[in-house]
Amino acid sequence: RRERYKSQDELLGVVQKFRTLGVPIDGIIQDWQYWGNNYQWNAMEFLNTGFYDPQKMVNDVHGLNAHMIISIWNSFGPMTKQYKELEKINALFNFDTWPQSGSEKWPPRLDYPSGVRVYDPYNPAARDIYWDYLNKGIFSLGMDGWWMDSSEPDHFNPKPSDFDTKTYLGSFRKVCNAFPLMTVGGVSEHQRMQTSDKRIFILTRSAFAGQQRFGANTWSGDVVASWAALRNQISAGLNFSLSGIPYWNSDIGGFFLWNFKDPLKNADYRELHVRWMEFGAFCPMMRSHGEGAPRELYQFGEKGNPAYDAIEKYINLRYSLLPYIYATSWNVTSRQSSMMRALVMDFAHDKQALDINDEFMFGSSILVNPVTQPMYSKTEVKAGDSVKVEDFSIVKSKNVYLPKGNDWYDFWTGEKFNGGQTVKKEVPLDIIPLFVKAGTILPVGPKVQYATEKKWDNLEIRIYEGANGEFTLYEDENDNYNYEKGAYSTVQFSWNDKKKTLTIADRKGSFPGMINERRSNIVFVGKNKGTGNDAIEKFDKVVNDSGKKVVIGRK
């Protein structure tokens, strides 16, 4: 949520603050320089004195029911043990890379060159060395995932001769595009050989065809915060998904804040950050990160502040949708589906939908149309300076195209619309247009502080009438690979719109810790009924089932 934490106390304090505020959080990332100076670049050891007891740090994060992810790079400083081993087998490249300065302070001192060199991930022996140190220095502590930065890799001042560099598989010119595949794959394959008890999680800045098999989520890089950048993230994510790699996200709020003076007090940036957060809630991964200002929601005020409340609202909404998101993720794994879907993937028959690049489907049922322009900030002159201030006096609207061939429900109001038309939706700061396809069966999970806090034994099941529909609820042990051996369960929900019946089929499969009984709280969505993320006071039907088929009538 900020560029990096300077100590383990600072990192742990953030997780504790979220728990105190009652705002959900599942993971925190430690970025670079926990290894100390740049001559020890990527040492895969906690040489920075601010991280005085890394085992305790990891244990404390886990004790707060959160996961910890850490930055690792594809290059090594000359004082690291890895550098010396890799140099012996000619598995280091000679071209310029990041960082160029030996000093970790900013701005860089180029008269003190770092000597950092990129390793050769095409070489299986180099990949073995890489994992050996990563395993002993960090994974053994119980680390939960990897932020693989600079996975292109960074290549500064490129010269034609750089591409003649010999790799294990030939010239760098020949294989450079596959660099991220090889380095990400090396970590993924080694971790999987090490254990099947912890699912692989890798966040990587770059990707290549086939990388989806390595448990990798790619982010869009260190983008500069602006409204144009936010708009561009939508089409970037959709094109990435169309390439066959389903897990993608961006630095919520933008990484660099060069365009904003005093950003946390700048109304324009605060609005941008909120809108980016709203978009991020409907990306395959929801993650905030950047330099120039810390990004935790409490940096934007406190409860009752419009920005704080909007951010909290969408974090909670993301968690409420976890049963839907987890089932969608299962479809990615089992049916080669995707999470963030360009309209052409579901509405190829609708010519008007083909050229739309600012809205998308999140899974098969939810249409998302992010707000990507400023609406609630204005310029005032104070003490001779022009400053941006908030102005919520007029609620603005946004046009939304609803693809034809389906009816659609406004997620926030329950109002029903015909497809094949453009509608105007009011978008106060805490609302982006969300529409749910008729025929959808949408499970809504419990309010939680972390993903696995509560079992899904008391789900709200929203029925969006107007078409037949199906949804398969998927559950497993959450953090191992036993599902590959069949340790999971599915329950199919089917809505027959003509007969007005909901069928909950026999549960299939089982796994350790599976619940035996579930309460399904059914609501038939209508105007101001079964809407938004608000608690439902009265359900239309309540069904208790023990895994056996149940048929429920509308009346």
Describe the residue ranges of each PLM region.
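Catalytic-domain carbohydrate-binding cleft regions of carbohydrate-active enzymes
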Residues: 1-431, 436-437
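Solvent-exposed beta-strand/loop surfaces of large extracellular or lumenal domains
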Residues: 409-429, 530-555
